[in-house]
């Protein structure tokens, strides 16, 4: 297993009951700046992304009773949901991690340049770690989320 940095921290995902309420705190108290909002009823979530001095926070709210966000909130309450790393050649890195015995879940390809998976919290001391590449810039966010 390599000990070189896996990639750049892209964003911190936080599960919340209400993105509107959480947004008030992040903007009003911390001074964050709204980037965009996205809703995915099929996957059962709404998210907003906020910038705070170059760090992106992704706030996730459940939509519907079978939402992964709702299940998370019921089990753990509001708080850290995941860390996302932008990893060059993520498909190859994910294969390498699996080869090294790291338990991965939720592997999927959005396009040839956009591939992701999650390191299981059981393998990473309780933290869900998302590894991917091709994450959207603000200008591409709306187009990317249509995939």
What feature does the model see in each segment?
Residues 1-21, 78-87, 136-147:
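N-terminal beta-strand motif that seeds the catalytic metal site of vicinal oxygen chelate
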